[in-house]
């Protein structure tokens, strides 16, 4: 079983809202997930405190046990939007 940390889409039409979830890679994008780690709201400016909110300790745990982050989650970490060094 390959586990991925990815975004699951929620919200209304033209008003997307995403949850950061840990899910089996074979499950549909918005399907069943193992754990919800936080959320991402692209409708807010990047400076807003609720643009991205993630449980960093759980994110670090899942990365340590071999879960793979998708491109978008990796980009958030690389750009410092999700700061995994603080926890």
From Swiss-Prot:
UniProt cross-references to InterPro entries, sorted A to Z: Ribosomal_bS16, Ribosomal_bS16_CS, Ribosomal_bS16_dom_sf
GO cellular component: cytoplasm; small ribosomal subunit
Keywords: Ribonucleoprotein, Ribosomal protein
GO molecular function, one term: structural constituent of ribosome
One annotated GO biological process: translation
Entry superkingdom: Bacteria
Entry-linked PROSITE patterns: RIBOSOMAL_S16
HAMAP family: Ribosomal_bS16 (MF_00385)
Family statement: Belongs to the bacterial ribosomal protein bS16 family.
Protein name as catalogued: Small ribosomal subunit protein bS16
Taxonomic lineage: Bacteria, Pseudomonadati, Pseudomonadota, Alphaproteobacteria, Rickettsiales
């Amino acid at each position: 079983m390959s586990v991925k940390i990815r975004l699951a889409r929620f919200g209304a039409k033209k008003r997307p809202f995403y949850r950061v979830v840990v899910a089996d890679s074979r499950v549909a994008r918005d399907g069943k997930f193992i754990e919800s780690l936080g959320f991402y709201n692209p409708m807010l400016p990047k400076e807003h405190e609720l643009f991205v909110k993630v449980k960093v300790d759980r994110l670090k745990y899942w990365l340590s046990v071999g879960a793979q982050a998708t491109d978008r989650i990796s980009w958030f970490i690389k750009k410092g939007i999700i700061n995994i060094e603080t926890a």
